[in-house]
């Protein structure tokens, strides 16, 4: 059977969630190919944290170098590994744009090499690219469409792959309606992506004033934050604190109980996007063009676009409330 290798240099859950629709679409289109995923951090999330998404077709490569592509020594080490394991891929797809990583990745024997690095210099075969999509995944999708004479279709994750136990749990945790999700914690601590606490409180109080129920999507480790919110918003709901289930599939199931969600750029945003529910996504130091989910109804607030600044604090509660009102009109 033929083989496709997808190289993903990101190490977070959000980085992995973002490529799911591409993985599914490749699997459906290239039915005579096996799909292999090479993650630079070797965390194999589809074998553990994301196992319940039931994407069982994804295979792990014999390339086990930690931080693959990020170390110059890999340029020399990959040769002996390739020879020892007789490694060859019909198609290699590069989902990052660092020159060093791409040069090392391209040393793996292949027929077709798809990469946007250095203005698509490493593409094999060569072809002209007119669409300059900023989101690298959708840039790659455009490349594949050209290769397949526009027959390649990007599909969405089917949440019916998730076991019923998660949806049953979501029904218990959120048994009514008029819920609005709020996600305000960030995984990457190197760039400030979190809104000020008082902004969150103002937004929550506004939601209550229009008969909505604020649902905080916060992991149990953030119990101090939960207590702080509860001291200000007595009717706040924290479903994850009332469940023994700790799995991203529960978040996706909870999302289907929400009218919409308000979130910063974090892993939860990408998890919720698999449910394809309406969303207000708030960006500060990160690029909304690169990282905003492609879902049916998303309202993007970017401080870079609105104020030419990476300061997320410039996106005030009043600005967010405008988007809330817009979603209310659209969803009612």
PLM regions with names:
Residues 1-12, 182:
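Nucleotide-activated donor-dependent transferases that construct or modify glycoconjugates
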Residues 8-10, 36-71, 232-239, 298-304:
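Conserved nucleotide-sugar phosphate-binding/catalytic loop shared by glycosyltransferases and other
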Residues 8-20, 187-196:
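A short, glycine/small-residue-rich beta-strand->loop->alpha-helix junction that serves as a flexible
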Residues 16-28, 42-49, 53, 203:
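Short amphipathic alpha-helix
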Residues 58-159, 179-186, 190, 197, ...:
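Conserved nucleotide-diphosphate donor binding/catalytic pocket of glycan-assembly enzymes
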Residues 115-119, 130, 270-332:
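Nucleotide-sugar donor-binding patch of glycosyltransferase catalytic domains
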Residues 161-217, 221-227:
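Core catalytic architecture of nucleotide-activated donor-dependent transferases building glycoconjugates
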Residues 197-285:
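Donor-binding and catalytic core of enzymes assembling or modifying cell-surface/extracellular glycoconjugates
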């Amino acid at each position: 059977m033929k083989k496709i290798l997808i190289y993903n240099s990101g190490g977070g859950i959000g980085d992995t969630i973002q490529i799911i629709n591409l993985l599914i679409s490749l699997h459906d289109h290239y039915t005579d190919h096996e799909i292999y995923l090479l993650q630079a951090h070797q965390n194999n999330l589809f074998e553990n944290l994301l196992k319940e998404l039931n994407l069982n077709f994804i295979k792990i490569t014999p390339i086990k170098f930690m931080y693959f592509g990020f170390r110059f020594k890999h340029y020399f080490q990959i040769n002996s590994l390739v020879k020892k394991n007789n490694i060859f891929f019909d198609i290699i797809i590069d989902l990052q744009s660092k020159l060093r990583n791409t040069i090392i990745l391209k040393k793996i024997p292949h027929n077709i090499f798809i990469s946007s690095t250095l203005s698509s210099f490493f593409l094999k075969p060569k072809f002209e690219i007119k669409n300059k999509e900023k989101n690298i995944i959708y840039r790659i999708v455009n490349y594949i469409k050209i290769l397949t004479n526009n027959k390649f279709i990007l599909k969405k994750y089917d949440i019916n792959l998730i076991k019923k136990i998660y949806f049953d749990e979501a029904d218990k945790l959120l048994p009514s309606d008029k819920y609005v999700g709020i996600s305000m914690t960030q995984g990457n601590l190197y760039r400030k992506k979190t809104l000020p606490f008082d902004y969150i409180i103002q937004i929550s109080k506004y939601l209550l004033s229009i008969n909505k129920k604020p649902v905080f999507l916060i992991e149990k480790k953030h119990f101090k934050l939960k207590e702080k919110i509860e001291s200000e918003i007595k009717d706040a709901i924290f479903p994850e604190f009332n469940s023994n289930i700790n799995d991203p599939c529960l978040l996706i199931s909870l999302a289907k109980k929400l009218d919409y969600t308000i979130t910063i750029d974090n892993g939860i945003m990408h998890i919720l996007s698999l449910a394809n529910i309406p969303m207000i996504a708030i960006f500060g130091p990160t690029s909304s063009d690169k990282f905003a989910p492609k879902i049916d109804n998303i309202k993007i607030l970017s401080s870079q676009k609105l104020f030419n600044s990476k300061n997320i604090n410039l996106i005030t509660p009043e600005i967010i409330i405008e988007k809330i009102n817009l979603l209310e009109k659209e969803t009612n």
